[in-house]
Amino acid sequence: MFGWHWLLEWQTPYEFHGHLIEKVFAEEKTPYQHVTLVEFTRFGKGLIIDGKVQSTLYDEHIYHELLVHPLLLSLPKPPKNVLILGGGEGATLREVLKYKSVEKAVMVDIDEKVIEFAKKYLYEWHQGAFEDKRTSLIITDGLKFINETKDKYDAIILDLTDPIKDSTSYMLYTKEFYEKLRGILNQGGGIVTQATSPSFSLEVYVTIYNTIKEVFKEASASYTYMASFDGLWGFVYGGVRPDLLSEDEVNSRIRERISGQLRFYDDYSHKISFSLPKNIKSEFKKITKVSTEKDPIYVPA
């Protein structure tokens, strides 16, 4: 399938980000979602799910490094067992496996087709992580897995699609779900979730923070600019406080715990990412909503 067309990615009901597509590598409507792998004119190779850009070759490393490393470096002990929900491209798994201490990384994704596409087309993302002997890949619903697992983990990473109404993942942003995660964490463990965009869904970003803080008591929020997402992108951490790590602590723990190169994350980017601007911090005082199964939060688009 060659040629070109435009992807109009709706970020709110009244604005979109237009992406020129040079080539479509693969496209399929699975039982769970519409998956497309393309070559963007500006951002290179990219994954689209249900009309939303999930990651691109241009800046996926920024997203995945900030998702993974503040959590794993802030754990009191180097992690041994890590659980990933989502993250079908394999890049979150790639970053987790950089930790010398990791003995087992369990990755759970609902859609086998995304994994199949990633293995075939997205080597730059996973870089062989699916074949690592420490990797355990499970194809099932994340909520079902959490309800049934008997194992406990040092860290849980939620690399999920946005909480869109009637999607496969919106119930994975609720208080009840986070309580289940707390129950399968080892002592001293923590979680992180992608938390949508402070640019386009600030109320959702803050509500995810409120919900995690309600369950874990300890919580912190970070953000970064993602050009391929056309705005700021947020992350929320629970059970640990990566925002309290000093620059020296970040540097020393990178040296001690990580084997492999980081392209974005370091002591300086850590500090900047947790330095929320005044206008965003003020919303944390105004918005008090907590997402529950009876009243879940959704992104506006």
From Swiss-Prot:
Question: Which GO molecular function entries does the Swiss-Prot or TrEMBL record give?
Answer: spermidine synthase activity; thermospermine synthase activity
PROSITE patterns xref list? PABS_1, PABS_2
Gene3D superfamilies, per database record: Spermidine synthase, tetramerisation domain (2.30.140.10), Vaccinia Virus protein VP39 (3.40.50.150)
Q: Does the keyword Repressor apply?
A: no
**Which Gene Ontology CC terms are recorded?**
cytoplasm
Domain PABS residue range list: 4-240
Kindly identify the residues recorded as the active site.
D159 (proton acceptor)
Reactions catalysed: S-adenosyl 3-(methylsulfanyl)propylamine + putrescine = S-methyl-5'-thioadenosine + spermidine + H(+)
* Ion transport among keywords: no
> What are the GO BP annotations of this UniProt entry?
spermidine biosynthetic process
Q: What is its EC number?
A: 2.5.1.16
**Top-level taxon of origin:** Archaea
Main location per the UniProt record: cytoplasm
Cellular location(s): Cytoplasm
Q: Which UniProt keywords apply?
A: Cytoplasm, Polyamine biosynthesis, Spermidine biosynthesis, Transferase
Query: Which CDD domains does the annotation name?
Result: AdoMet_MTases (cd02440)
The record's InterPro entries line, in alphabetical order, gives: PABS, PABS_CS, SAM-dependent_MTases_sf, Spermi_synthase, Spermidine_synt_N, Spermidine_synt_N_sf
Fetch the PANTHER family from UniProt: THERMOSPERMINE SYNTHASE ACAULIS5
Functional note: Catalyzes the irreversible transfer of a propylamine group from the amino donor S-adenosylmethioninamine (decarboxy-AdoMet) to putrescine (1,4-diaminobutane) to yield spermidine.
Quote the subunit structure annotation: Homodimer or homotetramer.
Q: What family is it from?
A: Belongs to the spermidine/spermine synthase family.
What's the protein here called? Answer: Polyamine aminopropyltransferase
